[in-house]
UniProtKB/Swiss-Prot annotation:
Endogenous activator of intestinal guanylate cyclase. It stimulates this enzyme through the same receptor binding region as the heat-stable enterotoxins. PANTHER family: GUANYLIN, GUANYLIN FAMILY MEMBER. This is Guanylin. Transmembrane segments: none annotated. Keywords: Disulfide bond, Secreted, Signal. GO terms for cellular component: extracellular region. Disulfide bonds join 69-82, 104-112, 107-115. Intestine and in low abundance in adrenal gland, kidney, and uterus/oviduct. One of its GO terms (molecular function) is guanylate cyclase regulator activity. Belongs to the guanylin family. Its main location: secreted. The gene is Guca2a. Residues 24-100 form a propeptide. The keyword Disulfide bond applies.
Length: 115
């Protein structure tokens, strides 16, 4: 009976970890990996607009954080970072993970937990 109860508790614990999934942490903020992956798709949609105005883009780099945060498809879980003064830097780090999320899924980044 005790072995069966212990097995059930272990199984429930493993299930809880799987349901929570992989979390990406940046400072005091943490985000689900699935939300971070959505950044890649948002940037792919945004790229054609930036490329069509190439000659203007060479003058001054335009911050992408306000533009990304204002999109309706921007993940709700990432919204708290939009209010941070260093949102641009945080987005750059998250985009690096979004470009190759497999490395986060195997916990190659120190910022990723829950593997």
């Amino acid at each position: 009976m005790n072995a069966w109860l212990l097995s059930v508790l272990c199984l429930l614990g493993a299930l809880a970890v799987l349901v929570e999934g992989v979390t990406v942490q940046d400072g005091d903020l943490s985000f689900p990996l699935e939300s971070v992956k959505q950044l890649k798709h948002l940037r792919e949609v945004q790229e054609p607009t930036l490329m069509s105005h190439k000659k203007f883009a060479l003058r001054l780099p335009k911050p992408v954080a306000p533009e990304l945060c204002s999109q309706s498809a921007f993940p709700e879980a990432l919204r708290p970072l939009c209010e941070k003064p260093n949102a641009e830097e945080i987005l750059q780090r998250l985009e690096a993970i979004a470009q190759d999320p497999n490395t986060c899924e195997i916990c190659a980044y120190a910022a990723c937990t829950g593997c």
